[in-house]
Amino acid sequence: YSFCKRMQDKEFNKRAVESLIKCGALDGLGANRRQMLYAFPEISAQLENDRRRNIDGQLGFFDAAPSEAPQGEYRMPTLEEMDKRELLRLEKEMTGLYLMGHPMAEYEQLAECLGCANTADLRNADEVGGIYKDESRVDLLCIITNVRKKITKNNTTMAFITAEDVFGSIEVIVFPKIYERQTQLFTEGNVILIHGRLSVREDEEAKL
């Protein structure tokens, strides 16, 4: 409440405040992000009502409904914080970066046990040597961060997805037969295990 009141006369719009909440910039204010996102519209409305009262010096239309808290106060609702994956998703959406950690960090040990490749090694693959090369068969445990669908000449659907682990990201081409058979898997935010063939071409980024 105090932050919103101080910013009331500044050029701080609703989207700017919500962005600050989502990326964690306001975590030090004593409430969790879910609480702040829920409360911000109510606080804004209350501050606007208070401002109008001060201007008018009397009750008016905006005072018709009694406030749950006296002027100058706000009672924060009791809400549990969002789960970590949702917090990370919002951070990435707002800043382009994960700030609290990485959603794939908890899967690193599993990826190692499964003998999975990592995106750093795949991106650095050499056509003629190294751990991985063109046409190498690889497994990649990853989170899907982007899905771009395309209709082919045969009127089937394929997809280009961005697969990410703690080391970076790589593009994965999902051909029609696989995409149509497993469409539900290829959704942003899903953690999946990909079995694919590496494609390495000169002057192009490696892809699966």
PLM-predicted stretches and their roles:
Residues Y1-I131, R197-S199, K207:
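Sliding clamp-binding short linear motifs
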Residues G30, P103-L208:
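Single-stranded nucleic-acid-binding OB-fold domains
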